[in-house]
Amino acid sequence: MKRVGILGLPRSGKTTVLEILMQGAGSGAPGGAARDHVGVVRVPDERVDRLSALYQPKKTTYAQIQFVDSAAAGHTSARAAAKGPDLFSGVRTNDALLLVVRDFENPAVPIEGGVDPARDLRNLQAELILNDLAIVETRIERIGKELRVGKKQGEREHAVLARLRGLLEAERPLREEAFDAEEQKLLRGFQVLSLKPLLVVYNQDERSTRVPPEPGAQALALVLRAHLEREIVALPPEERPAFRAELGLAEDGLSLLIRACYRLLGLISFFTVGPDEVRAWTLRQGENAVDAAGEIHTDLAHGFIRAEVVACDRLLEAGSEAKARERAWLRLEGRDYQVQDGDCLEIRFNK
């Protein structure tokens, strides 16, 4: 399951964003750090609904993404200085980061210096970069000691870290830089924050007219009216579409956020179907049939023979697997087949 960490300065509305993501469709639990909250969010997908209506299975399972509302950001002063990289230890395990930036006026919730989304985004990015710099400098110091006593195996790592330090000191997020395979492997071990895929959510209200600043290269941005979305979620489900239409909102906030996270992480959904269960699975775009088999169960990947594949839309159009097979819409694919978004798979394997 992919994890997305939610960060934001105080009074930015990041907890409201998590409430929108939850909206009764997932489950929540306290995290490990003070005031962290974890939400397992069901990914809405009308294809799952339609497949479930077709198969009438005993169980229907949607894809899931875990969101972590972190208490780490916004402590650049005494707490950050005392804690250093440990303050962000839980954040580093996430696959991507979602930064909530305040872009609304509310006298009841004042903010020092006034509302300035460009400033707040710079401050949040600076926290991530400073945290990465602390990690890199600690490692450079350790390797330097080893090199001084004649241990040469750390020379390559030391050179890479020196490059990283230069980039970070220049306040350049690592996600905007190019790294070779060896460097990428090294970076994965450090779980540096400024390398992670980044989604910036500008939290506006219905009166906001400001065009939000660009988040930089290798990052996505979207505008969300979090307070309004929370009010809509509080309505009975049957009343929500009409209310959204009246306000001119084409898409609900949950779908908007999930779709952005899928794009950010390069994810697709594939399905397994049958009378016992209809289930959605996530996979990275470009991964193959063996990767998909491994998502279902490692035994399927180890014993993989072939994958029987049919596009979800074709299966629904046919009305059954038998009719899809009659129309030659089911096909067998080998281990190198790149799974497409919406594929229904049945894995054939050696037991």
Regions found by a protein language model. Name each.
Residues 1-107, 112, 118:
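Conserved G1/Walker A P-loop phosphate-binding module
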Residues 15, 41-48, 64, 81-84, ...:
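Amphipathic alpha-helical transducer elements in NTP-driven molecular machines
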Residues 41-44, 71-81, 92-154, 167-179, ...:
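Conserved Switch II/interswitch segment of TRAFAC-class P-loop GTPases
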